[in-house]
Amino acid sequence: RLQTVTGVQTCALPISNLQSITIPAGVTSIGSSAFAYCDALTAIVISDGVTEIGDRAFNGCTSLKKISIPESVETIGEKAFQDTPWLTLKQEGSTLVIINNKLVDGANCSGNIIIPNGVTSIESSAFADCTGLTGITIPDGVTSIGNSAFSGCDNLGSVIIPESVTAIGNSAFANCTGLKSVSLPKQLKKLENWTFIGCTKLTEVTIPDGVADIGIQAFYNCSNLKTIFIPKSVTAIRENAFQNTAWMEAKKAENPMVIVNAILLNGEGCSGNVTIPNTVKIVSGSAFFGCTELTGVVIPDSVTIIGDSAFSSCPKLTSVSVPDSVTSLGGSVFSGCSALTEAVVPAGITEIGEYLFWGCTSLEKVQLPEGITSVGEYAFDQCDALTDVYFGGTQEAWDMVSVGFCNDTLTGAVLHYGESLPVENPSYPKGDLDNDGKIDTSDIFAAMVYVAYKGAGLDSGTTPEQIAAADIDGDGKVDSTDIYYMLYYVALHGAGQKVSWEDVIS
């Protein structure tokens, strides 16, 4: 008997000789797989107050025949009672197993099924792999459809989801290969990951106005999906959400960069040097993944987010300009870019994602901002050419950075504290920050703004070329000394003395 506990944790009690148990008052949750495979367990009493039974909590309890479930239970996880005699008895009594108005199991259903009124949720995996299911009527009053609720129902032809539904879980209709049409409720705010992945007969979908986020691979491999209505309310479209759809192929034929609602979804058809339009705010995950002919990318300062694996496996990519406007840089963004030799991580980034530069075998120099607090696992793994790391902060600040597993190439490189990555062969003449052919007070002012903003930890918008032009003494950083040299240079030239930079420095 459990006492003085408030929760039974994941995989808590895999005890082979446990025969009965009472979950006492005070416990509010039973974790995932908490009693899984306790094959001697025959009975369990769950006291009032428990609100959640986790995924597979009693999975594989092959002797469990008696379960007392109180009305306080609000959530029943995926396959919580799978392979128990208790569930088998329930299935023999009805093809729809309903507990506390929650539809837990319908795996033995076939044909067209009408879910009864009063049901408030369809729980995770309730109809998963129910190949005999051809149609489903969901009553108004159902508010949620759980993860994988109808996944693998390959004969399910159409679904009308009532307006009462506000949440649809991950993979809810994944691989419903016979699904031809679906009506989504207007109250929906997000399409979760893999919601309709592999629905190969789906031809048209209207995403309701109000949806803000479309999850990872939400419609991936919906090969016949030709028509998609995406409202302006959508502000995030995750990795490969529409990949391998007829809609995406048609968009790529129109323009190698597919952009929707200021989100760059796909650029895999691009080659050579590419400039992303300044209307783009987000580069979605895997947007340029495996773009074998891409050699250079210029990212505008309108972009704030670059998703996971956005430029991964671009073997000819030698240069990329990431502006300081980017405040979110996903994992594996440049992994496998084997020709990349230098990289600058934007000033607003505080965490270096896992596998960020993994396998960048030609990477020699990298600039990291002073505000970073952690470097993810494998971020610089297999970067064997890395020799120099330019860190914007002090050695003391670097010592506080948490560096994850498999980053020996990073920690073994030469650290340059308080310095920026030097620009070799800068395109702007020394001192001419606006590249207008003359060196005057406007250039001095631009350098002063850069130094002031950098000191305050802010982004001045100064480009690498401008920074290189302002580094008068060539010590790898721009500071008050460089500004002094510029002032002296302008003053002498104003007095008619045509001195060189070497004269000024000496």
Regions found by a protein language model. Give the residues of each.
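Consensus positions within tandem repeat domains that build extended binding/scaffold surfaces
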Residues: 31-36, 54-57, 77-80, 124-126, ...
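Single conserved hydrophobic/aromatic residue that forms the stacking wall/gate
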Residues: 1-11, 15
